[in-house]
Curated annotation (Swiss-Prot):
Family: Belongs to the DnaA family.
Protein name (Swiss-Prot/TrEMBL): Chromosomal replication initiator protein DnaA
GO CC terms, sorted: cytoplasm; plasma membrane
Pfam families for the chain: Bac_DnaA, Bac_DnaA_C, DnaA_N
Alphabetical list of SUPFAM superfamilies matching this protein: P-loop containing nucleoside triphosphate hydrolases, TrpR-like
HAMAP family in the cross-refs: DnaA_bact
Organism: Rickettsia africae (strain ESF-5)
Lineage: Bacteria, Pseudomonadati, Pseudomonadota, Alphaproteobacteria, Rickettsiales
Location of the region described as Domain II in the Swiss-Prot/TrEMBL record: 83-124
Region (Domain I, interacts with DnaA modulators): 1-83
Gene: dnaA
Residue ranges of the region described as Domain III, AAA+ region: 125-343
One BP term from GO: regulation of DNA replication
Function: Plays an essential role in the initiation and regulation of chromosomal replication. ATP-DnaA binds to the origin of replication (oriC) to initiate formation of the DNA replication initiation complex once per cell cycle. Binds the DnaA box (a 9 base pair repeat at the origin) and separates the double-stranded (ds)DNA. Forms a right-handed helical filament on oriC DNA; dsDNA binds to the exterior of the filament while single-stranded (ss)DNA is stabiized in the filament's interior.
Length: 463
């Protein structure tokens, strides 16, 4: 037998064991329904030249797993054995060499007792997709990314960003960065004790410790770690006992030069129903805002995701998704997955028209409601005039022209009548608004610079 080909030798058996662990991780992360649909009938075949070969039951399952999950499976294998460089999925089994993982214990994170949560099993709480390598950096998140990276690379020392407080809307990358910190430390400093969990689970385990009279054990566990990461800290707002425990845990860790990373949907100063002493401490280190995505960042995220999934998507479809799915990264990636899944299931080509039909309901919910007030603020800012000038009767050209442009955009981008628009501009009548719109339309016929300016304003307002 060639030394490069391993078919259930001792090392081969080790690969079988690794596949068992990988399958368990897939089950824990994706849940029973999805696991049973895609992974339960996948077999380990062999390993050859640092490539793991798996067998899927059908061509369809093989193609679906390859397009959507191959990178995840490879990263999981590499976590347990870093000599593995690639995976191959086939549909023809080799006799006598398979290991099927169909029945798995149903133990999930919720079943992990307090004594089990330590640096050895942080992996079970981390998403393999969320690493620094696949985090797309842009202007809205570059500070948060740099700070998270500094925390991860601190090599046992506490970073200057302690605590690191990440805040921003849903699906913008806060959790991704926290998982990335955990992965980096796990891979480069495995001796460091790290805990990552949501504030809800922190509360759940605290209540459980109170009920089981294990509070001392709870305190020792959380106050002896090197890095504590708590996601969605806003969950403890209004929960006095949990806040008290968190406060003392926070103080102990900071006093002992241990790193804390916290995420929230708002800044510390905007938190309600939380003690001032906690609010103050949350702002001690670096507070980094993760802003809403820009078109350029969304484009980068889509291109990165498409490359990872090894699929081909027409450029006009990518541009369409980046322009229309503006709420958050989670919805953007979900829309892309839906388009790819529809194509795989129906065997239809991915086209702009098909994409628009597939995402019709999602696009409707993502349509941004633009108000006259939004337009006034944006135009006033663009032309460096006071917002109050929008409602004034000043006839100076540097004031009147932006006001006319704002009226034009209000008619183009909102469902308001001319009379309603006039009311927003200092109770002007509909004929004044009509005159302003007509004036701008006349200028647009010959003024290329103005045409580009209004096009830019429209794009900014819509995105």
């Amino acid at each position: 037998m060639s030394t490069n080909q391993i078919i259930l030798t001792d090392q081969g058996n080790n690969y079988v064991n690794v596949w068992s662990h990988v399958a368990q991780d897939l089950y824990n992360h994706y849940g029973e329904t999805l696991y049973n649909s895609w992974f339960s009938k996948v077999n380990f075949i062999e390993s050859s030249l640092n490539t793991v070969i798996l067998c899927a039951p059908t061509n369809f399952v093989r193609d679906w797993i390859k397009s959507k999950y191959s990178m995840v499976i490879l990263q999981l294998f590499q976590h347990y054995n870093n000599t593995i460089k690639s995976i191959e999925i086939i549909t023809k089994e080799l006799p006598g060499t398979t290991q099927t993982v169909t029945e798995l214990p149903t133990k999930t994170f919720a079943d992990i007792g307090s004594s089990e949560l330590n640096s050895e099993n942080i992996f079970s709480t981390l998403d393999v997709r969320f690493t620094f390598d696949n985090f797309v950096v842009g202007a809205p998140n570059e500070l948060a990314y740099a700070a998270a990276r500094a925390v991860a690379e601190s090599s046992g020392a506490v970073s200057e960003s302690n605590p690191l407080f990440l805040y921003g809307g849903v699906g913008l990358g806060k959790t991704h960065l926290m998982h990335a910190i955990g992965w980096y430390i796990k891979q480069h400093n495995p001796s460091r004790k790290v805990i990552y969990m949501s504030a809800e689970k922190f509360m759940y385990q605290f209540v459980k410790a109170l009920r089981n009279k294990e509070v001392i054990s709870f305190k020792e566990k959380f106050r002896s770690v090197d890095v504590l990461m708590i996601d969605d800290i806003q969950f403890i707002c209004g929960k006095d006992s949990t806040q008290e425990e968190f406060f003392h845990t926070f103080n102990t860790l900071i006093d002992n030069n241990r790193q804390m990373v916290i995420s929230c949907d708002r800044s510390p100063s905007d938190l309600d129903n939380i003690e001032d002493r906690i609010k103050s401490r949350l702002g001690w280190g670096l507070v980094a805002d993760v802003h809403s995505t820009t078109y350029e960042l969304r484009l980068g995220i889509l291109e990165s995701k498409i490359e990872q999934m090894n699929v081909k998507i027409p450029k006009d479809v990518i541009d369409f998704l980046a322009s229309k799915i503006v709420s958050n990264v989670r919805e953007l990636e979900g829309a892309l997955n839906k388009v790819i899944a529809h194509s795989n299931f129906t065997l239809k080509e991915i086209t702009l028209e098909n994409t628009q039909n597939i995402l019709r309901d999602l696009l409707r919910s993502n349509e941004r409601i633009i108000t006259v007030e939004d337009i006034q603020k944006k135009v006033a800012s663009r032309y460096n005039i006071k917002l109050s000038d929008m409602s004034s009767s000043r006839r100076l050209r540097e004031v009147a022209r932006p006001r006319q442009i704002a009226m034009y955009l209000s008619k183009a981008l909102t469902p308001k009548s001319l009379a309603d628009i006039g009311k927003k501009f200092g109770k002007k009548d509909h004929t004044t608004v009509m005159h302003a719109i007509k004036k701008v339309e006349e200028l647009l016929e010959n003024d290329i610079e103005l045409r580009e300016e209004i096009h830019l304003l429209m794009k900014i307002l819509q995105n």
